[in-house]
C-alpha cells in the first residue's frame, strides 16, 4: 500500500515479507516491481531507504517512485535499481518527463488527468517507456491525514482495521472511493475496447490498478486483459462477451475511461467514439 505506513500487512513495512515476495515472483518467472510511498514525509525516508535496500539486494526488476527526493536517493545510493515514475509524480508535460529521465527514470506514468492525445505528444518527445492504465480505480489524490479516521468515533472505526473495508463518497450521481489517506475514482477505468487502438499507437506497458482490491479481482481481471492483449496482437481482435461477464461483477459502480479522451473522468466512451453510460 503506497498511501499509509500503518496499513495492515503492508510489505513496505514488513521487509522480510517483501524480500520473500520478490523471491517467489522470480521463482515463478515473473518480474517484481517494488513501489515506494506516494507522499513520504522526511521522517519516513529512513524506512524508504530500507525498502530500496531490500529491492536492490533482492534484485527487484524496478522500483516505482512518486517523489523527486526518493528518486534522488535511488540515483545516489542505489544506482543499480531501475526506476519507474508513478502516477503521483505529477507528469503533465514533456519537460517534466524529460527531467525524470535525465535523473535516471526509464518508465513514465503520466498523471491520470492527462489525455491520451497529450500522452502521445509527451511520448513522442521523451526517450522512455510510457505506462498506460488499462483497468482499475484511478488514483486521484493522497494526503497525510486519514479521511476515515476523521470521523472514526462516529463511524466506529479504528486503525488499522478501518481501511480494510470499502468506503465510497457519494454526491448525487458522483462517487469516489476513500482509502483513508488516498482517494480513487469510484468507477473502474476500463480500456478493454480500446486495446487495439493503444497497441497501434505504440504502447506496450500497461497497468491494472488493484490497490485495496481482492485477490479474485487481481487474478480474474488480469486474465481477461492478458487474453485481450494476446488476441489484439495476433490480429484476431474480437470482444468476447465473457470478458464483460468477468469484469462487471468486480466493478460495482460501473466503468469509465478516466480522462483519456478529454472528457469528464466519469464517462465511458466506446471504441466507436460514442458516449455511453456503460459498455453495451
Language-model region placement:
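Active-site pocket-lining/capping segments in soluble small-molecule metabolic enzymes
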Residues: 1-89, 109-110, 116-280
Amino acid at each position: 500500500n503506497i498511501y499509509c505506513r500503518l496499513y495492515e500487512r503492508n510489505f513496505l513495512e514488513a521487509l522480510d515479507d517483501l524480500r520473500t515476495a520478490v523471491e517467489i515472483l522470480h521463482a515463478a518467472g515473473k518480474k517484481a516491481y517494488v513501489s515506494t510511498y506516494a507522499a513520504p514525509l522526511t521522517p519516513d525516508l529512513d524506512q524508504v531507504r530500507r525498502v530500496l535496500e531490500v529491492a536492490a539486494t533482492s534484485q527487484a526488476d524496478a522500483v516505482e517512485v512518486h517523489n523527486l527526493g526518493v528518486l534522488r536517493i535511488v540515483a545516489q545510493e542505489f544506482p543499480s535499481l531501475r526506476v519507474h515514475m508513478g502516477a503521483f509524480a505529477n507528469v503533465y508535460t514533456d519537460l517534466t518527463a524529460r527531467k525524470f529521465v535525465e535523473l535516471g527514470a526509464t518508465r513514465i506514468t503520466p498523471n491520470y488527468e492527462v489525455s491520451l492525445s497529450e500522452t502521445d505528444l509527451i511520448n513522442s518527445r521523451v526517450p522512455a517507456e510510457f505506462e498506460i492504465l488499462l483497468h482499475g480505480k484511478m488514483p486521484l489524490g493522497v494526503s497525510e491525514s486519514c479521511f476515515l479516521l476523521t470521523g472514526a468515533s462516529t463511524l466506529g472505526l479504528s486503525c488499522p482495521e478501518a481501511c480494510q473495508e470499502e468506503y465510497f463518497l457519494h454526491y448525487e450521481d458522483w462517487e469516489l472511493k476513500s482509502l483513508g489517506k488516498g482517494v480513487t475514482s469510484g468507477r473502474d477505468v476500463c480500456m478493454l475496447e480500446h486495446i487495439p487502438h493503444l497497441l497501434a499507437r505504440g504502447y506496450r506497458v500497461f497497468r491494472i490498478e488493484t490497490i485495496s482490491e481482492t485477490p479474485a479481482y487481481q487474478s480474474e481481471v488480469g486474465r481477461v486483459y492478458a487474453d485481450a492483449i494476446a488476441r489484439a496482437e495476433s490480429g484476431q481482435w474480437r470482444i468476447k462477451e465473457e470478458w464483460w461477464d468477468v469484469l462487471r461483477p468486480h466493478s460495482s459502480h460501473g466503468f469509465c475511461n478516466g480522462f483519456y479522451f478529454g472528457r469528464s473522468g466519469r464517462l465511458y466512451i466506446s471504441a466507436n467514439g460514442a458516449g455511453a453510460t456503460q459498455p453495451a
